[in-house]
Amino acid sequence: MLKLAIPKGRLEEKVMELLKKAGYTFQKESSILREGEDVTCFMVRPFDVPTYLTYGVADIGFCGTDVLLEKETSLIQPFFIPTNVSRMVLAGPKGKKIPEGEKRIATKFPNITRRYCESRGWHCKIIPLKGSVELAPIAGLSDLIVDITETGRTLRENDLEVLDEIFIIRTHVVVNPVSYRTKREEVISFLEKLQEVMKNDNHEKSHR
């Protein structure tokens, strides 16, 4: 049996739609979904997906580039699935330059932010937050933020602007390396079904 880690929230609907097209229909039992005797899904927080795989609780998962880079995982990443593309960005108050000297940066992604600052040669004080990061510059908590944006609407509503694009965020299929060895046939069969669905979807779009 394959065990999948499915992220709750914005990616959940897209992932479940893909699985349904691949022939998997699930019956819900609290946060566990079962598809016959072949596949079990755990519905988990996006940031917990790599943990479920790393500790061998799940064989395959779905998570964003942001989670993979923040967690610094060594999971196999065979391909990504088509979802709305978002960006990890550095943003600050509109019309203001990036401050000289030490920069205070609020973020939900301290590891990504630390590596970004190091790559720029910046001396930064990183302020980890769980909630609305875009409020930090307004409140005077930080000079800048590092956060995810899709349309830029939330930034504009808070009088912020993008100062730098750090990377593009996609939704990756990830595989536990041990599962890839011990359940190779099951894993490959599952991945091929997903790829076939995506291939057919792309074919339909190109002929519209």
From Swiss-Prot:
Pathway: Amino-acid biosynthesis; L-histidine biosynthesis; L-histidine from 5-phospho-alpha-D-ribose 1-diphosphate: step 1/9. It is an enzyme of class 2 (transferase). It comes from Thermotoga neapolitana (strain ATCC 49049 / DSM 4359 / NBRC 107923 / NS-E). The keyword Manganese does not apply. Keywords: Amino-acid biosynthesis, ATP-binding, Cytoplasm, Glycosyltransferase, Histidine biosynthesis, Nucleotide-binding, Transferase. It is found in: Cytoplasm. One of its GO terms (biological process) is L-histidine biosynthetic process. This is ATP phosphoribosyltransferase. One of its GO terms (cellular component) is cytoplasm. Heteromultimer composed of HisG and HisZ subunits. InterPro entries: ATP_PRibTrfase_cat (IPR013820), ATP_PRibTrfase_CS (IPR018198), ATP_PRibTrfase_HisG (IPR001348), ATP_PRibTrfase_HisG_short (IPR024893). Its EC number is 2.4.2.17. Catalyzes the condensation of ATP and 5-phosphoribose 1-diphosphate to form N'-(5'-phosphoribosyl)-ATP (PR-ATP). Has a crucial role in the pathway because the rate of histidine biosynthesis seems to be controlled primarily by regulation of HisG enzymatic activity. It catalyses: 1-(5-phospho-beta-D-ribosyl)-ATP + diphosphate = 5-phospho-alpha-D-ribose 1-diphosphate + ATP. Pfam families: HisG (PF01634). Belongs to the ATP phosphoribosyltransferase family. Short subfamily.
